[in-house]
Curated annotation (Swiss-Prot):
<dbReference type="GO" id="GO:0019843">
    <property type="term" value="F:rRNA binding"/>
</dbReference>
<dbReference type="InterPro" id="IPR005824">
    <property type="entry name" value="KOW"/>
</dbReference>
<comment type="subunit">
    <text>Part of the 50S ribosomal subunit.</text>
</comment>
<dbReference type="GO" id="GO:0006412">
    <property type="term" value="P:translation"/>
</dbReference>
<comment type="function">
    <text>One of the proteins that surrounds the polypeptide exit tunnel on the outside of the subunit.</text>
</comment>
<dbReference type="Pfam" id="PF00467">
    <property type="entry name" value="KOW"/>
</dbReference>
<dbReference type="GO" id="GO:0005840">
    <property type="term" value="C:ribosome"/>
</dbReference>
<comment type="similarity">
    <text>Belongs to the universal ribosomal protein uL24 family.</text>
</comment>
<keyword id="KW-0687">Ribonucleoprotein</keyword>
<dbReference type="InterPro" id="IPR008991">
    <property type="entry name" value="Translation_prot_SH3-like_sf"/>
</dbReference>
<dbReference type="InterPro" id="IPR003256">
    <property type="entry name" value="Ribosomal_uL24"/>
</dbReference>
<dbReference type="InterPro" id="IPR005825">
    <property type="entry name" value="Ribosomal_uL24_CS"/>
</dbReference>
<dbReference type="InterPro" id="IPR041988">
    <property type="entry name" value="Ribosomal_uL24_KOW"/>
</dbReference>
<keyword id="KW-0689">Ribosomal protein</keyword>
<dbReference type="GO" id="GO:0003735">
    <property type="term" value="F:structural constituent of ribosome"/>
</dbReference>
<comment type="function">
    <text>One of two assembly initiator proteins, it binds directly to the 5'-end of the 23S rRNA, where it nucleates assembly of the 50S subunit.</text>
</comment>
<keyword id="KW-0694">RNA-binding</keyword>
Amino acid sequence: MHVKTGDEVLIITGKDRGKRGKIKEARPKEQRVIVEGLNIVKRHMKPRGPTRPGGIIEMEAPIHVSNVMLICPTCGRASRTGHRFLEETDHKGRPKKVRYCKACDAVIDE
């Protein structure tokens, strides 16, 4: 996936199109992310004991990763990302793989 937990993203399709938010949770197997405060849905929940009352609860629903675009921390624009290998090596001796912004060519995570 091109985004990780904690990244700031722009929603590019759907009812929240054009809004920005921070990724709260990433689900790589499902290719979905949960963005804080966006894609709010209402769930009708049954009471589950004295600690969890029932009722209509608003919660954030997952969004497919293809519907979000990473906002580059360097240039501040929503842009596509790519992967490249650095000269440095990780703890296993392999080249370190990092994400970079295709608009400004800056490394996103080090």
